């Protein structure tokens, strides 16, 4: 039985502009064939088992000819695979998607087109330029700048284009001087506002503005390279009023997120929403404890405990996973009082239908100790399911009040093997900030570096403009112990507060 090919538009660069339908077929494909302009983050939406084939074309460097790409799609579909052909922008707007669809149709193979947000409208929009506006024009033309404007058989109708309110030219940086000259020659006013937008909708976005007459010179002066979109028309002047993306507080900042990949999304998405370029280098990942028996035993005798204290969201999830394995659910905690370090831990408990009697306002053991002390706990049996390696101040203090405390490892943290390579790449490309959300993220990152690397990171944090952001005082102290200067530490030890503090730092 033959498979099916989905021609999916990846959008202009911002991964959030992928359509819901595009994300859905990506999540269930057997093979992914993708272009240079498709955001690499989108590849993570495909199953780990899916084959990934890069067929990108960058300038004159073609990984694979169009004919071979067509045949590859036919071969994969002929083998019964569900294939996603991920193309930058929209597959049917200067994307050669029509040729690929024709090749599939010629062999009787099933295909479906899932349109994408074309860069022809998205890049101008992110630069604050509407391609149509009743105050300026109600017509727009999309053209390719990849064609040689001087070839005898050119299909470019310059006389007609010169009369259209907005002309949007894709892939035209190389030929920009000729394109502008041709429009002026055809009667377009040389003083017409114009703009070039490179890497539109991404944190690398770069915008150059001018007139039809001087834009080529301005583009050359700043060294603007492809991929870029050119907009010609009165609408380009609206950028002065409507520019928004490049004004975001973290626009263009390269920020490393060191949380575990499974937990990074909230921090990464919050920073991305403020314009940052996120580099995820997970310095920790979470695994079950090497010996699961202590947790299993504790779960089997919950009726013996008066209190269960959770010190992290991971501890909650690991505990409930063990509870489920034992064939139990939250009802087993009916006789226990619950305590949580920080609102994030309490929120995960609430997701399981439970409300903590005691919640520390800050995400640190000392905050929970203060809250529990006010409760007057003494003569109680207390269970603390937590990380295999953790500070002892909490169980020791509670035990000193006359309680019987049992600590069981619910999970352990390890350093992902691929992170050393990711860290080296990130540091070589340059960073504006590194975020740390736990002491273990600091320790693991620094242990990936040799002494020279640690010294250089410390130097950059003090002299080179690298901002170290720590979620709380314990994490900050760990960073300082490695010689790092911590410039950002929120008063409230939460992800949201960390994002706000980092934004405020760069805005100041």
Predicted regions and their residues:
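Signature of uroporphyrinogen-III synthase
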Residues: 12-13, 59, 65-69, 77-79, ...
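Short, well-ordered beta-strand core segments
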Residues: 30-32, 52, 130, 167, ...
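Conserved anion/nucleotide-ligand pocket segment
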Residues: 150-195, 401
